[in-house]
């Protein structure tokens, strides 16, 4: 289903049973996991909500997900059009996403920070998208696109690590929805 608000995503993915969850990934990104019990303490990175039946749900919400990625896809679309290859937007996304499957696991040393806006999970008040690399990094299209996709997920990982490493939350099924998952396999594989 398309990205929606927290309640819509929970219902649309049927992520209301114990140890299930969903990730909504579009302009912003959030993960919601149904818990056995409330967390042991308050974490500023995690919001607590409930299922319709009242079970506790941990929600990690990040303000920026695909905005920076979308900007780069537009640039590549402009380049393709300038070369006479007018690609439909979904095809352009598929080409660029699928290219990430050829990338180095570490993105060849490329790093992207996708913050278009402030990010409470990392304590930043304002966004500053940033792409960096060392002179010896492997700058390829595959590595560049993987760095872009990883940046959509990196901040979410901070909150998820709190749930799994500090709170020992159990998860048996996690379903993804939203624009990040429109191209089959790629978003799911990298998010996993």
List the model feature ranges, each with a label.
Residues 1-192:
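Active-site core segments that coordinate phosphate-bearing ligands/cofactors
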